[in-house]
Every structure is written in structure tokens, then in C-alpha cells.
Amino acid sequence: MLSYADRLRSMRETKIRHTLEKRKQNGYTDLDDFGTVPISEGYHVEPWYNSENGSFYGFDGMSENFCRVIDAHEPYVDPMEMLCGRWRDMLVNYRGDLHYMPDWLKNSLKNKEFLAAGATHQWSKRWDEQRFPYDDLKPLQEKYNITTGIDGDAHFACDYRIGFELGFGGFLEKIEKYRKLHPDKSAFYDAEKRCVEAIIRFIDRHIQKIEEMIPNETRPELRENLSEMLLTCKAVRYDPPKTFRQVCQWTAFFNCASRIYTRDGAGFQLDGLLLPYYERDKAAGILDDETAKFLIANLLLIDPHYYQISGVDENDRDRTNALSYLILEAADSINIACNLTVRVHENCDKAFLGKAVYYLLKNKNGWPRFCNDKTLAEGYMRNGVDKKTARERIAVGCNWMCVPGREFPMNDTVKINIAKVLDEALKDLRNEKEPSTAALFTLYKKHLSKAVEVTAAGINLHLDHAEEVTPELIMNLMMLRSLETGTDSSRCAELYTIGVDGAGLAVVADSFGALEQRVEKEKILTWDEVFAALDSNFADERTRLILSSSDKYCSGGSLADEWAKKLTE
């Protein structure tokens, strides 16, 4: 009889094989290790473009093409697993975004024609520039190498508690309930309904596949597993999940759908939302810890959504529980790219924290990550929110936080390259009669103000029209007030704390520090020599080494450290 360890080993080997196959299919990629499986032979999607520029937008365009892509997905069932479902493809691949597009799609004749019509690495067709142009912003966006956030999708977090309470059938009932209250929002509700029905069809294909597989499975334990999987899928196709296995399977199906739609990878407080199901099933005698660990490992395998574990509540009570430990053990048992973040605080369970660090060092696989509650909570409270909300703002992204279901932060989609801002300031410094770091800093602030202004204009454009371009039809289902009002998450959020990354802080701090140290204090170099080095791309080795060997940011008490503080005040 196969043990859980045997099955996990097989699942991990399959994951590695799939990764190697995807590398051949996709070519070079600089992305997350998604939970995708390879594209099957004969897979094809015929996108529907509802814009003259050859792309699709809005409620009709996004819902229709989501249905086409998810309907093209074959069911994925592995008898070794307790949960089923995988995703293979995503809508962004059909909107001219070269960053995400895999080789298998780039090489198709129709897509080559699409790309030839104007999609580039910087300007894809994800934004409807025919209706909402921003040519007036592009010169400064290019000048300061700004990642604008215009056309940025997902990068917020929905509240999974809503889905766990309603189920997919509950979504449909809620859509019809509020459609009656907002008859003028029929396009919104039609689109939401189409998407939910497509997810249910996705589940139905898995049900059919499992039914076909059960008679042919020779191992009794795997045949029994498939029978349980079938009952689980039937239970969650319409109704809300009631057991630990059901809630994990429901999450797996939703995560596949949200990834297909906009690559959404924001999960939830994993040891919090799943805890009631775990405790209830344990008390009922229908779940043991080894099975719970296997199910969690299976969920992490299906897709590496970003989850937070541990943490602290608004009363400073540690949130670590038995499931927190099991999640770490589950991740260790599968040991793939698991996007788990441990929230560390003063009252953190020291044994749990030690175990988390142990797994990081043992597996050397980049998990778990750690975030500091004190800095994150106190920093967010400076925006005027209360302590409870700050503690609910959890780590559910690659480098960002969000209050699930309430916040629309655009995190990690907007960046100003402050090294490029410094470069422009250095160009202007040549015109100064007496160059100095003080004069350079004044010029830097002038250019930074311009960069911030044009960035804000781009953000406002996105917020004004995101619903008309890329409405978040899947995440809307679990966003507070979205279905209730018939409006997109971008317009109905309670909190708008737009995050703008200042990329290049270390480079700029080091540069200011090097100039002050080598030119002004030590007088080893002159400003003319610095300008000559910039013009020649530091061809003179002596000048390059003098500047590069200056005291660096984070070395402790350096000029660069002082500049870093000044740059961020």
C-alpha cells in the first residue's frame, strides 16, 4: 500500500518533469514558478477581439475570453493526489504582452501577425489606448524609466471567507440578487455570471474525468482516493465547502481560475481561514494530522499562491496554532517553491519561529519568507488606519501586503527608477558654475518631483478606466461591495493606499556618498573627471575603482547611509 510519503515523492517527481517540459515549451522565462502543467497536444484558443486595435477589453471582452481559455483547459487528475485541477494558460498571453508570452504561443502564425501590429516590450495591448490614450505622459515616463501601473492587473487580495461562505453557486445567487437592485449594471452582472458558470464547467470536466478513471484504477487505495475526490468535487461545484478536504479543493479550483484570468496569486491567512475546518474535522474524527499535511502539500503543489502564516492580532496575541506547524511540515514534505510568509512579532512562538528558520536553511528553497509585523503595522497605521486593520494587512504577494477584500493598492505595479532620476540630475549639474552634491541633490529633487507628478497622472488614468479595460471579474467575487454595487474592485474598494516603489535607492545613495567622499571631502577626483568618466562609461580604470571602492550604503555610519536617510525623508 502506498504511503503518503510515497505519493508525495511521486507528485514531486511529476512536478520536476513538468518543469523541464515547460522549459522546452515556453523558452526563457523570468516569472514565478507557477503551478502550471505543460500545454497538451492540440491545445488551442481562438481569442475574440472586440477592439479595432486587435485586443479585448471590458466586461464582454474579458469574460468571453476567460471562458474561451478556461473552457480549453483539459481536466488534470493524478490518482496520487487528493486534490485535482491545474491551469496551463492565461488571458494576458492573448493581449500582446511579450514579457509573459511563452514560445509555444509566440511561434503561432496568428500571434505573429498580432505582434506585428504594434505590441512591444514596453507598450503591450493590455491597455486600450484608442479610448484612453496617454501619449502626453510617455515622454517623461520614458525619461525616468517609470513602470507606470497603467494596465497593471490583480496585485490586491480578495477575501476568501466570502467564497468559503457562499460557494460558486452562492456567487450566482448573489449576482442575481443584486442584479435586481441595479438593473443599469446588467453588463457587469452578465460578465460575472459567465465567469462563474465557466468555473463550474471546469469543475464538471474534472468530475467527468474522475468518473472515467475510477473503473480503471487497479490500486485499491488510489481507487478509494479517486472516489473521495469525486465526492469532494461534486460537493463544491455549487455548494460552499464544509470539510477540510472540500475547502482545500474549493481553493484549488478558484486559484486556477484566478491565475488564468489575471495571474492573481494572492492567497490568505492560511492557518487562520482553514483552522475552523481543521478543528471541526479533527473533533469529528474524519481528519488526522498526516492527512491534513498531505492536503496542504497538495494545495501548495497545485499553485504557489502567496500565503501568510502566524502573526499577531489587534490585541497583540500570537496567532500561531497547531495548523501553523502542520503547514510548515507540509511544505517541507513537498519542498517546492512555496510562497509562505511567516509574520514575525515580539510575542511570536519561539519554537515555531525556530522551526521556520530551520526549514529555510535545511531546504535552501527560498521558503518560508519572513516579514516584520512592527514595521509593517506601524508604518501602515501612519495612513490613518486602526491597529486591527493594520494587522489584517497580510503578506499575499511577492513583496507586498494587502487588506483582503477591502484594499486596492496596485502594489508592485508602479515603480520610479530613481537611479534614472539621478542620471538626469547629473546631466543638469554640468551647467552649474560650482557643481556640488548639494546642488546635485536640489536638481535630483526637481526631477523626482516631475517623475512623481507624471506617475500620479498615470495612476489616476488607470483607476479611472481599469473597469472599462480589465475589470477584475474573478477577484470581484470575493471583494467587499463589488457584487453588492455592480462595480469593479478598482472603484469600490474601501482603502486606496497606492504603493510606488522607488527602485534604485542603494545605487543613488552609494552615488551621492561616493561623490561627497571622493570629490568633496578627500578631493581625489574633480567634478570634470567625474563627468568625463560618465561620458566614457568609466573607461578609465583608476576613476572607476576610486568611486566604486567608496563606503557603501548599509555598511554602517557611512556617507551613503546618511544620504539614504536624506533621500527617503
Label for each model-derived stretch:
Residues 214-217, 221:
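A conserved hydrophobic secondary-structure block that centers on an alpha-helix together
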Residues 201, 205-208, 212:
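Extended, non-transmembrane alpha-helical coiled-coils
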Residues 190-201:
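Extended non-globular scaffold/tether segments
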Residues 1-192, 221, 225-228, 232-239, ...:
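Conserved catalytic cores of very large enzyme subunits
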